[in-house]
Regions:
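Structural preference for beta-strand elements that scaffold enzyme active sites
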Residues: 291, 332-336, 363-364, 407-411, ...
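Short Pro-Gly-centered flexible turn/kink motifs
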Residues: 101-106, 284-303
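Short acidic, Pro/Gly- and aromatic-enriched capping/linker segments at domain boundaries
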Residues: 1-12, 270-287
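Active-site beta-loop-alpha junctions enriched in small/polar residues
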Residues: 180, 256, 298, 335-340, ...
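Catalytic domains of carbohydrate-active enzymes, especially glycoside hydrolases
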Residues: 349-372, 471
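Aromatic- and carboxylate-enriched substrate-binding clefts and catalytic-loop regions
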Residues: 369-499
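Polysaccharide-binding surfaces and accessory modules of carbohydrate-active proteins
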Residues: 5, 10-17, 21, 31-264, ...
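Conserved, mostly hydrophobic/aromatic
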Residues: 18, 165, 289, 335, ...
Length: 499
């Protein structure tokens, strides 16, 4: 069994081929993180926790007169908020009375076969329930009664453990989620470096390596996308770890929105590491019976350096994240007209590029930006997803047919989330753009962003794309996104639901 639970149901050990992950629900229901690293078998590591009286670290009521028991110093699996742990929290809740506190205690745990799924978000999948198991830990908030479920997906052969969490409002009054991270853990007795991958436009994923110290190292994005500036992944590793030697802990967030990642030593030199949705401008109203899910974090451990860690991620993502026919097929070699023509093209230019590319063995022609609406530069036309037949005489079906006659596949460019102010769509529906009333919006590439939370926006886009893709033989879609999101506001969701 990849997941082992002690007879009293409070010591939980996760085993992969080469790693172990252990937690303990103590007598007060606090969920403690004991260990993550090389395999330990059935060893009980609860004796690793050494408590001491630390000044200015207070004590919960259950401690009584025991000043060595403090949420501020215990190595935890879920970081409480506002109740005595002065390190970074992982769950922050605001309540109708104006208070802001969260203190979750262990209730129960269970093991189920197969991988868990997350509504509306990507997660590793297991089609036959033979490759994975899931540990589900139920916790309850002491005052509000809110129910927290922690999910641990275990991929034994792949040396991967996934984490996510869900929060359910079990009370009558609304709860306001202000922070809800996917993963938090406190690692004892470690002296580690943090590796992150930063960058900018046209120069993404530049590796940076820095020691984890008492000064918090935090990176992330508030752009509405993970972005090329900061990749939603990090590696914690031994100070002297190399490609082929040393302990390495990988954390990869399966989420393309705003995110945060953090590592910091506390006063006892434990390292708190966290990852999840960025709490910047985040406030989610959870009404009675509603549940909120966090995105998935994919963890992997290697005791043989970065190379093994990389291969473990390659294998799990290829086999259990990728879908469709090209999961195991070679993808076609393509040519794109953008750098050759920019907006200045017609069907004859595209056919000529395709013909020359086909002679070189290139297998797909992708038609880029400029085929729709009044789109002769980047100042206009976005959102008007109707073929410009002044450029493409006979329309896309005819062009696609000619490309296929050359023995090539045909692909098409879209930027669905964007809108130009100089467009028929904006003139008809200015409220569909993300703008704040009374403020002139920020422009990037001369465009605004559509409010994709609106059903009418989604319905319009689906109707246009279904018509285009349904009437034209298209094997590939280039889905672009050329700006970040700001001026956060919705013209249909008010107050706490907007932003």
């Amino acid at each position: 069994m990849a997941i082992q639970i002690s007879p009293n149901g409070r010591l939980m050990t996760i085993q992969t081929n080469d790693s172990s992950y252990q937690m303990l629900a103590d007598k007060n229901g606090v969920l403690l993180h004991l260990y993550y690293g090389s395999s330990i078998g059935a060893e009980d590591l609860s004796d690793l926790i050494v408590r001491s009286d630390v000044g200015f670290s207070g004590n919960p009521e259950e401690a009584g007169l025991d000043r060595t028991y403090s949420l501020d110093t215990l190595p935890q699996e879920i970081a409480s908020s506002g109740v005595g742990d002065f390190r970074d929290d992982s769950v922050r809740l605001a309540h109708p009375d104006g208070s802001c506190a969260a203190d979750f205690r262990f209730e129960s745990c269970e093991v189920v076969s197969g991988a868990y799924s997350i509504p509306g978000m990507p997660a590793l999948y297991d089609t036959d329930k033979k490759n994975s198991e899931t540990l589900i830990i139920k916790m309850k908030e002491k005052a509000s009664g809110a129910i927290l479920h922690l999910y641990y997906g275990v991929w034994e052969e792949e040396n991967v453990i996934t984490r996510t969490a869900s929060l359910t409002n079990a009370g009558k009054e609304p709860i306001y989620i202000e922070k809800f991270l996917s993963c938090s853990m406190d690692m004892m007795d470690r002296d580690l470096d943090l590796i992150s991958f930063t960058g900018r436009h046209a120069m993404e994923r530049t590796m940076e390596r820095t020691p984890v110290t008492h000064i918090k190292t935090e990176f992330g994005s508030i752009r509405g996308t993970s972005s090329h500036h900061y990749n939603p992944a990090m590696i914690l590793c031994d100070r002297h770890a190399t490609e082929d030697a040393g302990d390495c802990f990988g954390l990869c967030l399966a989420y393309s929105g705003s995110f945060t990642a953090m590592a910091q030593k506390d006063q006892r030199d434990q390292i708190r590491v966290q990852m999840g949705i960025n709490p910047y401008q985040f406030r989610w109203c959870l009404t009675e019976g509603e549940t909120f899910f966090a995105p998935q974090v994919i963890l992997s451990f290697s005791n043989q350096g970065f190379s093994k860690l990389s291969h473990q991620y390659h294998d799990i993502l290829h086999e259990h994240m990728c879908r469709g026919r090209y999961k195991h097929e070679r993808r076609p070699v393509l040519i794109n007209n953008w750098e050759a023509t920019y907006f200045d093209f017609n069907e004859e230019k595209i056919e000529k590029i395709a013909a020359q590319a086909g002679e070189l063995g290139i297998e797909m022609m992708v038609l880029d930006d400029g085929w729709f609406g009044k789109r002769d530069d980047d100042n206009s036309g976005l959102g008007d997803w109707f073929v410009n037949e002044k450029k493409i005489r006979g329309g896309l079906p005819k062009l696609s047919e000619k490309i296929h006659e050359k023995g090539m596949k045909f692909g098409l460019w879209f930027e669905p989330e964007m809108i130009s102010e100089d467009s028929d769509l904006y003139r008809a529906h200015p409220d569909w753009a993300i703008t704040i009333p009374g403020r002139v919006p920020n422009h990037a590439r001369n465009q605004l962003v559509l409010d994709m939370t609106r059903s009418d926006v989604r319905d319009y886009l689906m109707a246009r794309f279904e018509e285009i893709l349904g009437n034209t033989k298209i094997e590939y879609v280039k889905w672009d996104m050329n700006r970040s999101i700001c001026d956060m506001y919705s013209h249909i969701y008010k107050g706490e639901q907007s932003g």
